[in-house]
């Protein structure tokens, strides 16, 4: 209930407003590179979600303070990054030691997933890229019918 959660690529806040009640003493950071999306979230949050804040990121930086976030949520966003290494480093810095990343991407391994290949990621690729940032793969859930739900952690050392 006290976690700081950053939704990277928050869009209009679909997940932001579902997470907000789960962290009543925490905070949800809605991060996006489009001010228009953040304006929508701010309008929706006014008077109803006091623990929601918006953050204007860039294509290379999520603009969140170092070691401030317990959980980063990336839903169908990572593959869109034009500068994945820089964004990855920025996310790693923002995570507290022991912090987690929940990464959701369409399954590249499954040809029945009717999404263009450029919008998919294999589990192997995701693990390789997250581990290159210093994150450790913790688990993959098969709860979603077409997407990987992968969990990574920042080492506590």
Where are these regions (language model features)?
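A short glycine-rich, Lys/Arg-flanked "PGG" loop and its adjoining helix->strand segment in the class I
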Residues: 85-100
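Core SAM-dependent methyltransferase catalytic element
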Residues: 137-139, 143-157
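Helix-to-beta-strand junctions that scaffold the AdoMet/dcAdoMet cofactor pocket
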Residues: 23-24, 81-82, 95-97
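A short acidic, Gly/Pro-enriched loop at the edge of an enzyme's catalytic core
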Residues: 62-71
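A short SAM/SAH-binding and catalytic strip from SAM-dependent methyltransferases
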Residues: 70-85
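Class I SAM-dependent methyltransferase SAM/SAH-binding core
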Residues: 4-62
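Conserved class I S-adenosyl-L-methionine
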Residues: 100-127
């Amino acid at each position: 209930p006290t976690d700081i959660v950053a939704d990277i690529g928050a869009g209009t806040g679909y997940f932001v407003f579902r997470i907000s009640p789960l962290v009543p003493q925490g905070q949800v950071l809605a991060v996006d590179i489009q001010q228009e999306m953040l304006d929508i979230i701010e309008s929706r949050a006014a008077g109803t979600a006091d623990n929601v804040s918006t953050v204007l990121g860039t294509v290379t930086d999520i603009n969140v303070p170092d070691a401030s976030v317990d959980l980063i949520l990336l839903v169908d966003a990572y593959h869109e990054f034009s500068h994945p290494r820089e964004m990855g480093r920025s996310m790693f810095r923002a995570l507290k030691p022991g912090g987690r990343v929940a990464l959701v991407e369409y399954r590249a391994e499954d040809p029945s997933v009717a999404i263009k290949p450029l919008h998919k990621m294999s589990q192997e690729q995701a693990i390789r890229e997250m581990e290159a940032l210093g994150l450790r793969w913790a688990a993959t859930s098969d709860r979603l019918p077409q997407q990987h739900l992968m969990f990574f952690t920042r080492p506590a050392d």
